[in-house]
């Protein structure tokens, strides 16, 4: 009999085969499900604490998505050779899972819940995030933990005018959209998308299409729960203390209503805190026994009731606006004198100081992703310190919220960036939130666009973002434009849309309630477009076009193309050549595999010097061309002359002078600069040089240099030069006696042939 009670459900989902399995692995977890989508395998587990911690006043849900490098057949590249802190992708995927799950836990459930997802195997063409979300939902559904799920999810692409279900990374390259939608069978709860300026109608259609496809996964999870689900927890929400509710309303309602008549955020916040304290004092004086957490929750309910009621009754919002008005906008560019580009974007009480910096390819970020390494040349970082909301807090590592907001702003801007071959810079944008009262991520989009234009980045169009909210009670609802922080907390939806005049580039939606219909989303998108166009108008007024020149403090990029086979010459042994070039010119030099060289420098003269040096290094010796260079080495049979950087040619002893050369050192010394002519090159790159080709032949020298003609010698053969004693050239040889006079030789010898029995003359002339 098997140890395991394994339950498996398999279904076809578009082009993918999906398997849900439980009962074999992680049996001691509250719920554990293995999800396999075309060989991408994830293990999703969930554990819930049986009791809430005393004094707990919020729902402590933690989601950890963890990619194991062995899933892709890799060993971690770190010094410790094991997985370390979460990557940005892991953080973003953890948030992606958290957002649709959190609203489905019942009100008042404060038990700690921990969802952990491990990626165990990865098919690069089947992304793990959708499998992780489905697995987390399934694990919660079978665990028995109070949960109003399950949740389904799907990715939607848009290729050739048609929606595509769960496209892989390769297919996404040709897609104009990457949208993830998650929700229950009844309603959409979360949307995360980037798009290439698509219309609101296309975006809404993708949400509806994705939700329909997600229902396929929900049906499979329900089947798994039917066969493998654990008993539901015996949990009931705490009974409402009606006498306490009445007393809190009696002492607090008027104070809360008065506080929400204050338009200034800081003053309103102070008034609310004072109201909380005064209510507790009044309760104590009245002899009411209460728990601070219970009173705080009841007062928060009064805040929500006050704000929501005012809006649904058509009264002004918290800051006095109607539902469609955008807060006043102030824009200033070129704020910081020595940065490459900067902008200060202020909308009401939300303000972003955004700075753009230009760098080279060496400044791009290397991403060691599970699906494969790549380099990212557009970086967007979002920071929100505690002082932005007038609070005291701890500064430290980047929080998940900051990572998520930065990625949303980046998604909004990427489609409008110039192509890399037109603008070769690495771009880093940093948004410093200096004030926050709602929609700081969308302020970062606006400020980021303006900062890059100030830096001289030729953006295709202006990009703006707006955050929308929703108040819904029964059949009544109101969509709010440009929501405040309080409206976000007290409302039912946070809906962020970014784009241009042509269409949407990013969309993020988080819904806290069920029952959001297609019609409501349609109204929200239309109202968001109206607000976006208003903000774009303000941005165009402040900065109509990008600066045509980059900042004086930014590096200029100069490009040149070389033969890829010459790359090794530019780099040199162990990087010696390029290192010397960098030190000499002060330029940053990047070399592409295709032979494209990018030189970055703030000094044009130094950049030109670097270009000349590289051109010299990669130049080919031209036959017949004259070069000047130093003698780098003396050889017995000639000398090596450096005619180009890294290129030496052979000057043979026979090509030094017209007359006979006995010793190379009689004519040349190491370090001497000489002019030479290239005679020929071979397929191995060897170069033959000549000095004598540049020297006029001495008078009386009719042919190549030869030894002087001996009296009575071999006919009239011209002056052959002083050949010196033969013994010196031929080594020790026996004396041969005195030669007979040339005139006494037979006439046939005059043609140059030796007499009978006479040894052949050695060919001593230089070749």
From Swiss-Prot:
Record flagged with keyword Cell division: no
Residues that hold Mg(2+) according to the record: 488, 494
Biased composition (Basic and acidic residues): 700-742
Coiled-coil region(s): none
Name of the top EC class for this enzyme: transferase
Subcellular location(s) per record: Cytoplasm
Region span, Disordered: 700-767
EC number: 2.7.7.8
Pfam families: KH_1 (PF00013), PNPase (PF03726), RNase_PH (PF01138), RNase_PH_C (PF03725), S1 (PF00575)
One GO biological process term: mRNA catabolic process
Catalytic activity of the protein: RNA(n+1) + phosphate = RNA(n) + a ribonucleoside 5'-diphosphate
InterPro entries for the chain: ExoRNase_PH_dom1, ExoRNase_PH_dom2, ExoRNase_PH_dom2_sf, KH_dom, KH_dom_type_1, KH_dom_type_1_sf, NA-bd_OB-fold, PNPase
Domain annotation KH: ranges: 555-614
Bias (Low complexity): 752-767
Gene Ontology CC, one term: cytosol
Alphabetized NCBIfam families for the sequence: polynuc_phos (TIGR03591), PRK11824.1 (NF008805)
Function, as annotated: Involved in mRNA degradation. Catalyzes the phosphorolysis of single-stranded polyribonucleotides processively in the 3'- to 5'-direction.
Name of the protein: Polyribonucleotide nucleotidyltransferase
């Amino acid at each position: 009999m098997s140890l395991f009670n394994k339950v498996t459900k398999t279904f076809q989902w578009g082009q993918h085969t999906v398997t849900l399995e439980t009962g074999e692995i992680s049996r001691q977890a509250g719920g554990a499900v293995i999800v396999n989508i075309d060989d991408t395998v994830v293990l999703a587990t969930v554990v819930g604490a049986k009791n809430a911690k005393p004094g707990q006043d919020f729902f402590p849900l933690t989601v950890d998505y963890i990619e194991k490098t062995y899933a892709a057949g890799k060993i971690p590249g770190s010094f410790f050779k094991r997985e370390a802190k979460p990557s940005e992708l892991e953080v973003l995927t953890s948030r992606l899972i958290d957002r649709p799950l959190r609203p489905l836990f019942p009100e008042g459930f404060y038990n700690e819940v921990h969802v952990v997802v491990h990626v165990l195997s990865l098919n690069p063409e089947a992304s793990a995030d959708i499998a992780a979300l489905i697995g987390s939902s399934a694990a919660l559904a079978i665990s028995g933990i109070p949960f109003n799920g399950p949740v389904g999810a799907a990715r939607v692409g848009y290729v050739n005018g048609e929606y595509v279900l769960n496209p892989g990374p390769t297919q996404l390259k040709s897609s104009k959209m990457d949208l993830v939608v998650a929700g229950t069978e009844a309603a959409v709860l979360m949307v995360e998308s980037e798009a290439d300026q698509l219309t609101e109608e296309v975006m809404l259609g993708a949400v509806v299409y994705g939700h329909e496809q997600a229902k396929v996964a929900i049906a499979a999870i329900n089947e798994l729960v039917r066969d493998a689900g654990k008993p539901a927890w015996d949990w009931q929400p705490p009974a409402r203390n009606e006498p306490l509710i009445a007393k809190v309303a009696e002492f607090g309602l008027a104070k809360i209503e008065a506080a929400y008549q204050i338009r200034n955020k800081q003053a309103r916040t102070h008034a609310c805190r004072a109201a909380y304290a005064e209510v507790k004092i009044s309760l104590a004086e009245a002899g009411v026994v209460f728990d601070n957490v219970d009173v705080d929750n009841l007062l928060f309910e009064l805040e929500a009731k006050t704000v929501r009621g005012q809006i649904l009754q058509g009264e002004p919002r918290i800051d006095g606006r109607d539902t469609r008005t955008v807060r006043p906008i102030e824009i200033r560019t070129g704020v910081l004198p020595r940065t490459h580009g900067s902008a200060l974007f202020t909308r009401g009480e939300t303000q972003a100081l955004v700075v753009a910096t230009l760098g080279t390819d060496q400044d791009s970020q290397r991403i060691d992703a599970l699906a494969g390494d790549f380099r990212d040349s557009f970086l967007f970082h979002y920071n929100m310190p505690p002082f932005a909301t007038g609070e005291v807090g701890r500064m430290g590592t980047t929080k998940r919220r900051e990572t998520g907001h930065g990625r949303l702003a980046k998604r909004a801007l990427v489609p409008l960036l110039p192509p890399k071959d037109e603008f070769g810079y690495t771009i880093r944008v940093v948004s410093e939130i200096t004030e926050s009262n709602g929609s700081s991520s969308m302020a970062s989009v606006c400020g980021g666009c303006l900062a890059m234009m100030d830096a001289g980045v030729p953006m295709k169009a202006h990009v703006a973002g707006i955050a929308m909210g929703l108040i819904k009670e029964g059949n009544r609802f109101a969509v709010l434009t440009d929501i405040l922080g309080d409206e976000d907390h007290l409302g039912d939806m946070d809906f962020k849309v970014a784009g241009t005049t042509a269409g949407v580039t990013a969309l993020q939606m988080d819904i806290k309630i069920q029952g959001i219909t297609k019609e409501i989303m349609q109204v929200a998108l239309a109202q968001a477009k109206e607000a976006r166009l208003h903000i774009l108008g303000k941005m165009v007024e402040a900065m109509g076009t990008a600066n045509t020149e980059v900042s004086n403090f930014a590096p200029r990029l100069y490009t040149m193309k070389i033969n890829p086979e010459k790359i090794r010459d530019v780099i040199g042994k162990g990087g010696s050549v390029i290192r010397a070039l960098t030190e000499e010119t002060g330029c940053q030099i990047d070399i592409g595999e295709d032979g494209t060289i990018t030189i970055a420098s703030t000094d044009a003269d130094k950049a030109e010097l670097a270009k000349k040096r590289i051109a010299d290094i990669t130049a080919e010796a031209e036959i017949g061309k004259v070069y000047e260079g130093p003698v780098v080495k003396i050889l017995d049979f000639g000398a090596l002359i450096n005619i180009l950087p890294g290129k030496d040619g052979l000057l043979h002893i026979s090509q030094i002078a017209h007359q006979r050369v006995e010793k190379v050192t009689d004519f040349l010394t190491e370090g001497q600069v000489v002019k030479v002519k290239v005679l020929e090159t071979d397929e191995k790159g060897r170069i033959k040089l000549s000095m004598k080709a540049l020297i006029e032949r001495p008078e009386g020298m009719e042919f190549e240099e030869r030894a002087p003609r001996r009296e009575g010698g071999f006919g009239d053969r011209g002056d052959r030069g002083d050949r010196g004693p033969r013994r010196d050239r031929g080594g020790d040889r026996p004396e041969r006696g005195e030669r007979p006079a040339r005139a006494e030789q037979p006439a046939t010898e005059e043609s140059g042939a030796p007499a009978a029995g006479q040894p052949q003359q050695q060919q001593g002339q230089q070749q």
